Amino acid sequence: MGKITLRNVQKRFGEAVVIPSLDLDIEDGEFVVFVGPSGCGKSTLLRLIAGLEDVSDGQIMIDGRDATEMPPAKRGLAMVFQSYALYPHMTVKKNIAFPLRMAKMEPQEIERRVSNAAKILNLTNYLDRRPGQLSGGQRQRVAIGRAIVREPAAFLFDEPLSNLDAALRVNMRLEITELHQSLETTMIYVTHDQVEAMTMADKIVVLNAGRIEQVGSPLTLYRNPANLFVAGFIGSPKMNLIEGPEAAKHGATTIGIRPEHIDLSREAGAWEGEVGVSEHLGSDTFLHVHVAGMPTLTVRTGGEFGVHHGDRVWLTPQADKIHRFGADGKAL
């Protein structure tokens, strides 16, 4: 079991209020991602759940037990940090087994758990190597293996892919997702990368200044952002946000339209503009178009659409894809 409940959780460092008041339910077996900009409180929230930071007020429940004052070792959670934190003088096998040896577990049970974790993570052939002989991705798998052998109620990941290059990050995203599908254990994952959040999560928690802006599935947040912050944060490239007379036509203070929901033409359309920068990615091209009275608009089109700097184009937003926001920033 790995159900985690937070009720009116607050965190203060002296006079600084990092998390004002927060309520959240994480169901057993869910893959939940905390995402937000730097300083939004996502890592602090994870550390509160882990017990590495004390709660200033409120309650944390793990599987129906009040864990607010419970020491980290008693919570039944396993954490994987951004840095691998492996012992360089120990073999992979000894690194994975370390928490079990510290718990004075029977040698036969340690062997069983280490062997099982190594199979899951494709580390069986590397058990006798030391961390210095491994790639970055393999080292991160060893760190995950050290968490798996504890057979926790939930896994806590604190930006575990930040130290890896782009190709390894893609591979590890897939491996962690497959691991979740295999173990069916609750996972809470912290990242500032909304691509990781969108591709891995069952449920995303968008945080801003210690407050939850929105909770939902990746597609729910993408299709129905609750406010301007979520609209501008979720999606890459980010949503185009337009104020002024064009927004007023739609009865809103601000309207939003995603780059792929703007139709592009060389002949006619709602808005005439001039192509500034073109980003050619092969399958897609992102055009940054200057339209009078608006911010520069980003348009996503096919990779074969040939336009150049200075070309005149016409843009038409798809009417059913326009998002409307009021003066308070909330979706209408």
Curated annotation (Swiss-Prot):
Annotated SMART domains: AAA (SM00382)
Binding annotation for ATP: 36-43
GO function term, MF aspect, one: ABC-type maltose transporter activity
Family: Belongs to the ABC transporter superfamily.
Source organism per UniProt: Cereibacter sphaeroides
Keywords: ATP-binding, Nucleotide-binding, Transport
Protein name as catalogued: ATP-binding transport protein SmoK
UniProt GO cellular component terms: ATP-binding cassette (ABC) transporter complex, substrate-binding subunit-containing; maltose transport complex
Keyword Transmembrane helix: no
Xref: InterPro entries: AAA+_ATPase, ABC_transporter-like_ATP-bd, ABC_transporter-like_CS, ABC_transpr_MalK-like, ABC_transpr_MalK/UgpC-like, Mo/tungstate-bd_C_term_dom, NA-bd_OB-fold, P-loop_NTPase
Matching CDD domains: ABC_MalK_N (cd03301)
Domain annotation ABC transporter: ranges: 4-234
Domain of life of the organism encoding this protein: Bacteria
SUPFAM superfamilies linked: MOP-like (SSF50331), P-loop containing nucleoside triphosphate hydrolases (SSF52540)
